[in-house]
From Swiss-Prot:
SUPFAM superfamilies: Clavaminate synthase-like. InterPro entries: Phytyl_CoA_dOase-like. Its cofactor is Fe cation. Belongs to the PhyH family. Fe cation binds at residues 17, 19, 93. This is Dioxygenase easH. GO terms for biological process: indole alkaloid biosynthetic process. Keywords: Alkaloid metabolism, Dioxygenase, Iron, Metal-binding, Oxidoreductase.
Length: 185
């Protein structure tokens, strides 16, 4: 999935986080599978004033988010517009504050995740009536609801994956759930 990121003047520094959520199937930390790669492209220059992405060196080998220390120092990326950083979803990082009065910091993040996190086949053949008899969890499993990562693994607004207009896809479609199957009555 992808996201356009815009940090305006006065944007605060983010909290330390990983882009790879803590899925029950794919955990973060050493000796675990890579579950996400982020192709992070700067659309504007990332400077000390507009804010640079900070990484905790070696954090992909730790289970906990942790804080920077002597063995895991902070590394800043000073990207120019058009530069792309490719990083593991396990890397602990954050965006720095934008201290400028009038400059926006913009980026494009394209995340690659394994196909095991999505339905194998398209489910467009399932009627809306049938989908509305399902629970919200079942609707997620057939791609008719957004998958939202629960706290504490979210950063800011919990937008999720597979959204419509940056909102939960089922709500945007007016999708109901747990409806009786009228055909069986």
């Amino acid at each position: 999935y992808g996201a356009a990121i815009e940090n305006g003047p006065g944007t605060q520094e983010q909290i330390w986080h990983r882009d790879q959520p803590d899925y029950a199937l794919l955990k973060a930390g050493p000796g675990t599978a890579e579950a996400m790669l982020n192709f992070f492209t700067a659309l504007t220059d990332f400077t000390p004033d507009t804010g640079m992405t900070q990484y905790i060196w070696g954090s992909h080998k730790r289970v906990e988010l942790g804080e920077p220390d002597a063995e895991h120092p902070v590394v800043f990326t000073k990207l120019k517009a058009g530069d792309t950083a490719v990083l593991s979803g396990k890397i602990v990082h954050r965006g720095s504050a934008n201290a400028t009065p009038d400059v926006f910091r913009r980026a494009l993040a394209l995340m690659i995740i394994p196909a095991i996190m999505t339905p194998f086949d398209a489910t467009c053949h399932l009627s809306r009536h049938m989908v509305e008899t399902m629970t919200p969890l079942a609707q997620k499993m057939v791609g008719r609801r957004s998958v939202v990562i629960p706290p504490p693994h979210t950063v800011g607004a919990a937008l999720g994956i597979w959204c419509l207009n940056m909102r939960e896809v089922g709500e945007q479609m007016g999708l109901k759930s747990n409806q009786p199957d009228k055909e069986e009555e």
